[in-house]
């Protein structure tokens, strides 16, 4: 008789274990980060380790390389961060901070894992040594100024030509 009483109990435990087995893979899948989320977490780590006064924010993320499906395997990443106006001591997220005009730009390379439970990254960042990065900013600003100047000149020519049209006397 004791065996019969424990029989349904054993069946319930089997059912509970079966349900847990079905639910656990879903919980594991939910802990996998997207490529960009993993990079943003790495940037948070960079900001925590940095001795610079201000936070850095993602400026450019290189295209995602082809990867295997294992979230525990380190994935190669490369991206660019730029200094923001927010001090490191702020509680703001870097995404909520504006970029600092002429802020320091750093090129970062390394690896991240997409498994949120492991949350590991190995990233190193160096000053962006692209010589023409600031030159590009110069040309953008010059283009705006020249565009505004040409617009003003065009308006003056239009006004001048409008005044040359013979007026009819009434």
From Swiss-Prot:
Propeptide stretches in the record: 31-131
One term under GO cellular component: vesicle
GO BP terms, alphabetized: antimicrobial humoral immune response mediated by antimicrobial peptide; defense response to Gram-negative bacterium; defense response to Gram-positive bacterium; innate immune response; neutrophil activation
Keywords: Antibiotic, Antimicrobial, Cleavage on pair of basic residues, Disulfide bond, Immunity, Innate immunity, Secreted, Signal
UniProt keyword annotation of Signal present: yes
Localisation: Secreted; Vesicle
MF annotations from Gene Ontology: lipopolysaccharide binding
Signal peptide bounds: 1-30
Disulfide bonds: 86-97, 108-125
First-listed, main subcellular location of the protein, grouped into a coarse class: secreted
Cited InterPro entries: Cathelicidin-like, Cathelicidin_CS, Cathlecidin_C, Cystatin_sf
Role played: Antimicrobial protein that is an integral component of the innate immune system. Binds to bacterial lipopolysaccharides (LPS). Acts via neutrophil N-formyl peptide receptors to enhance the release of CXCL2. Postsecretory processing generates multiple cathelicidin antimicrobial peptides with various lengths which act as a topical antimicrobial defense in sweat on skin. The unprocessed precursor form, cathelicidin antimicrobial peptide, inhibits the growth of Gram-negative E.coli and E.aerogenes with efficiencies comparable to that of the mature peptide LL-37 (in vitro).
Domain comment as written in the entry: The cathelin-like domain (CLD), which is the propeptide part, does not seem to exhibit auto-inhibitory function, as it does not inhibit the antibacterial activity of antibacterial peptide LL-37.
UniProt family annotation: Belongs to the cathelicidin family.
Protein name (database record): Cathelicidin antimicrobial peptide
Taxonomic source organism: Trachypithecus obscurus
């Amino acid at each position: 008789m004791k065996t019969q009483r424990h029989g349904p109990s054993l069946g319930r435990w089997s059912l509970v274990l079966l349900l847990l087995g079905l639910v656990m893979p879903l919980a594991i899948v939910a802990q996998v980060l997207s490529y960009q989320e993993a990079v943003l977490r790495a940037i948070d780590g960079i900001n925590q380790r940095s001795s610079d006064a201000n936070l850095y924010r993602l400026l450019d993320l290189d295209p995602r390389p082809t990867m295997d499906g294992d979230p525990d395997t380190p994935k190669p990443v490369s991206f660019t961060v730029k200094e923001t106006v927010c001090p490191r001591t702020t509680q703001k997220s870097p995404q909520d901070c504006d970029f600092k005009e002429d802020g320091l730009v750093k090129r970062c390379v390394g690896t991240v894992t997409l498994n949120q439970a492991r949350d590991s990254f190995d990233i190193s960042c160096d000053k962006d040594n692209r010589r023409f990065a600031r030159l590009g900013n110069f040309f953008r600003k010059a283009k705006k100024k020249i565009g505004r100047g040409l617009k003003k000149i065009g308006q003056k020519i239009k006004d001048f030509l409008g005044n040359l049209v013979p007026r009819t006397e009434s």
